[in-house]
């Protein structure tokens, strides 16, 4: 007979719930759920820091499974950026890295090098540029892996440095939070033009002097204007986005992707319908997205001393895809250490002011994104895609293996039930966590 016992531990403002199954003298951990208390939160503070991670010499770049492609130049620098929110009880770091994806094994390595923020409160996402070195350890057709492991470890160091510096630089701050449709040719769904989410969510951080010093842009798009076969290493459209935000007085930019799976990509179509794979097109799209984000947030009121909380939950998925099983088996980074047929990852939910943020460990299709945003509890509901892990595409069971168009994204999805498991676990976390502040009466 299995009996259940429950233990609660409070440390550094974090409430831990450990549920343990007990059979004889064998203890099997089942679930860890935590959330950060905010009853005596004190003054809200924020800080941001950036590190350049452009490799020297340049390395081949990856757009997914298979061999990387050589490059002969770079346009813009690859960076990692850390935005830290803090009050007297809670500290949360949001990290954006200019890579295709950043697996949890690397995220955990970076988290272990951070001082002052619980690892469960450090969210690490990838911009999903298709013009950066491979961080997965993909094998080529011959089984050879060319990922530069020293470079990967250096990136982990740079992430930790950025988080530590951002924490050191926190200052009293207020927030401007806004949601609106980004106008113009920025994104479209390659599979069906209009099946994408045009909403752009913006969190702008205002210093005591009344000036913005950081602007977070959350928008769903594949930064693949250039692609991996152009011979160019680049942050793609995200680099010009950052440059424009700073140039227009928005401070340091940080981009977090959204539910951009299947197949929400940059709208770089020329007059003849063919893709314009040029740096000039990166400049156009990145600049336009920055201008739209700044327009959307411009006239909203500041939120003084916003409430902050962070929840984290460990979830797991079965690995049914033969392709992804092979990828994990051959990778020096992704090789399973436990059950080879399951993967686990961290799911986060953040409340900050009137916004609620939920992480997605991969590329969820836009219909999943719309559904989650409807069910979340903030006045502004943000989804951070490719955050804390990058497990390929995330489809519902009715989409998986359906249209011929969905063949590729079904093969690069963990399995038929991936979307169902994720949605269920995400909404349970939403229900178990406090609702964010409401400013609209």
Residue ranges and their predicted role:
Residues 3-4, 22-26:
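Positively charged n-region of N-terminal signal peptides that target proteins for export
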Residues 25-37:
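Bacterial N-terminal signal peptides
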Residues 42-284, 297, 301-441:
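Conserved beta-alpha junction segments in alpha/beta enzyme cores
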Residues 289:
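Anionic-ligand-binding alpha/beta catalytic cores of soluble enzymes and soluble regulatory domains
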């Amino acid at each position: 007979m299995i009996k259940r016992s429950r233990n609660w531990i409070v440390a550094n403002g974090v409430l831990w719930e450990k549920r343990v199954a007990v059979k004889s003298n064998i203890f099997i951990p089942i679930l860890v759920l935590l959330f950060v208390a905010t009853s005596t939160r004190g003054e809200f503070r924020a800080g941001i820091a950036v590190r350049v991670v452009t490799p020297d010499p340049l390395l081949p770049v990856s757009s997914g499974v298979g061999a990387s492609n050589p490059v002969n130049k770079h346009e813009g620098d690859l960076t990692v950026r850390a935005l830290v929110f803090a009050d007297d009880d809670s500290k949360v770091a949001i990290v954006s890295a200019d890579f295709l994806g950043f697996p949890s094994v690397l995220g955990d390595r970076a988290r272990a090098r951070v001082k002052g923020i619980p690892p469960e409160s450090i969210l690490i996402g990838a911009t999903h540029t298709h013009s950066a070195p491979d961080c997965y350890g993909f094998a080529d057709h011959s089984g050879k892996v060319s990922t530069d492991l020293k470079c990967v470890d250096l990136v982990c160091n740079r992430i930790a440095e950025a988080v530590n510096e951002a924490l050191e630089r926190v200052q009293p701050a207020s927030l401007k939070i806004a949601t609106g449709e980004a106008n113009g040719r920025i994104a479209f769904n390659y599979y069906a033009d209009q099946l994408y989410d045009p909403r752009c969510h913006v969190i702008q951080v205002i210093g005591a002097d009344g000036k913005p010093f950081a602007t977070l842009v959350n928008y769903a798009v594949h930064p693949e204007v250039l692609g991996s076969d152009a011979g160019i290493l680049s942050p793609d459209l995200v680099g010009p986005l950052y440059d424009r935000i700073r140039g227009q007085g928005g401070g340091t930019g940080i981009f977090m992707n959204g539910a951009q799976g299947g197949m929400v990509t940059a709208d770089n179509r020329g007059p003849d319908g063919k893709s314009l794979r040029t740096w000039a097109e990166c400049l156009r799209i990145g600049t336009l997205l920055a201008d739209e984000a700044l327009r959307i947030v411009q006239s909203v009121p500041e939120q003084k001393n916003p409430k902050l909380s962070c929840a984290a939950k460990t979830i797991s998925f079965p690995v049914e895809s033969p392709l992804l099983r092979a990828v994990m088996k051959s990778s020096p980074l992704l090789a399973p250490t436990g059950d080879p047929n399951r993967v686990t990852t961290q799911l986060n939910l953040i409340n900050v002011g009137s916004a609620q943020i939920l992480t997605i460990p991969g590329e969820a299709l836009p219909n999943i994104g719309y559904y989650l945003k409807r069910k979340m509890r903030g006045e502004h509901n943000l989804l951070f895609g490719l955050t804390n892990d990058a497990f390929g595409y995330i489809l519902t069971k009715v989409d998986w293996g359906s249209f011929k168009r969905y063949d590729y994204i079904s093969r690069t999805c963990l399995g038929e039930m991936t979307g169902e498991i994720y949605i269920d676990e995400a909404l349970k976390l939403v229900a178990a966590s406090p609702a964010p502040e409401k400013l609209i009466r």
